[in-house]
Amino acid sequence: MDAASRPAVVIDNGTGYTKMGFAGNVEPCFITPTVVAVNDTFAGQTRANTTKGNWMAQHSAGVMADLDFFIGEDALARSRSSNTYNLSYPIHNGQVENWDTMERFWQQCIFNYLRCDPEDHYFLLTESPLTPPETREYTGEIMFETFNVPGLYIACQPVLALAAGYTTTKCEMTGVVVDVGDGATHIVPVADGYVIGSSIRSIPITGKDVTQFIQQLLKERGEHIPPEESFDVARRVKEMYCYTCSDIVKEFNKHDREPNKYIKHWSGIKPKTGAKYTCDIGYERFLGPEIFFHPEIYNNDFTTPLHVVIDKCIQSSPIDTRRALYKNIVLSGGSTMFKDFHRRLQRDLKKIVDARVLASNARLGGDAKAQPIEVNVVSHPIQRYAVWFGGSVLASTAEFYEACHTKAEYEEYGASICRTNPVFKGMY
C-alpha cells in the first residue's frame, strides 16, 4: 500500500505540550508534556567504566541508557517516584535545544503512542516563527535518516492556526495570528499564506507566566498549598477558574461586595502525608489573564499590552494588507481560551484604531474623511489545538503530498532541501 494513500502523521511540538495524531481527525490522538526522563544511573556507569577501561560494560550501560527513558506524563511520574530519573525539556521558547532528547521524544511518540511504522506515512511537523533554517536541516536528517519517512513537510505554526480559524466557506489565508503558547507568545502577520517576517512580534508573557503569577499570588496570600504541588495547582486554577474581566477596578469591587459568589474553593491531598488541604481562589481568577493587558503587574521590564503590540505589528506590515489583517485576527493556544479574552482584546484594539482614524480626520480638516477600519478577533472552540487542527486539514489535501520533500529528494540533494517548504494552496 502506497504511503500517500495512508493518512499523514501530524505532530505539533510545543514548549509545554506536544499534540500528535493523524490527518483528517478533528482533535489530536494524544496530548502529552514535551519532557523526557532519562535514567542517570546508566550514564554514571558509562563514565565509571570509561575511566576503568571496561569497554564491554561501557557499551552495555550505553545501550541501557538509550532504552531506559520515558516521555510526557510517564516521565513526570518517574521523576516524582525515583531520584535516578532526571527531566530534560528539549524545547525552550519554541526552539529545539537538545536534539538527542528530541529524537528520543519523537521515537516514543511514533512507536509507543501513535503505534505506526514511520516508513508507511508522510509526516507534517510544525515549527515556531523565526526558526533558523539549520533547525529544519537537523529535523530532516532525523526524520529521513533515523525514521526513514517517505516524505516530510515542516509547516509554520501561525499559518496552520490561520487555516484552522477561518469562519467562512472560503479559507482566508491573510490575517494576524496571536499564538500564546506555554513558552512563547508570537504575533505573526500572514498575507496569502506567506509570513511577513519583518513584522513578527514576540512578547515575554506566556501561558507559563500566567501560571507562575497565579502561583505567586496564592503564596503571597498565605494559602497552605504544598510547595511541590503549588505549580500544578496554579496551572489547574488557570485552566478551570480564570476569566478575562472588562475593568479590573470594577472586578475588585464585585469580589469585595459578594465574596461568596465569586470565590472558588480548591481541595487536594498532600502527596507526602496524604492529608487533605483546601485553599480559596479569589482575585487570582481575573488577575492571571490580566497580565496580557497590564503586564506591569507581573513584569516591570515589559509594560506593553498585547493589543498595543498587535497594532504595532499590523502598522509595520505593507499598507495594502493592513485592513485585511485587522479584519482577521486569529487566536491560537490554550492561554487564549479564557472567557471573554477575545472580546477584551477586540475592544482594546478597536479603541486604538478608532483613535487613529479620528486623529487622521482632524488633521485632514474636513477636506477628506478616513474610512473606518473593521477590527475582528476570531475565537473558535478548537483554538487550543488550532495549529494541530490546521495541520490535520492541510495534510488531508492532495496538494500536501506534492509539497512534501521526499526521501529520494533528500538522498539526491541532502538535508538542505528542508530549509524551505513551499506554501501550498490546499484550502483556498
Swiss-Prot record:
One of its GO terms (biological process) is Arp2/3 complex-mediated actin nucleation. SUPFAM superfamilies: Actin-like ATPase domain. Gene3D superfamilies: 3.30.420.40, Actin, Chain A, domain 4 (3.90.640.10). GO terms for cellular component: Arp2/3 protein complex; cytoplasm. It holds the Pfam family Actin. GO terms for molecular function: actin binding; ATP binding. This is Actin-related protein 3. It comes from Oryza sativa subsp. japonica (Rice). The gene is ARP3.
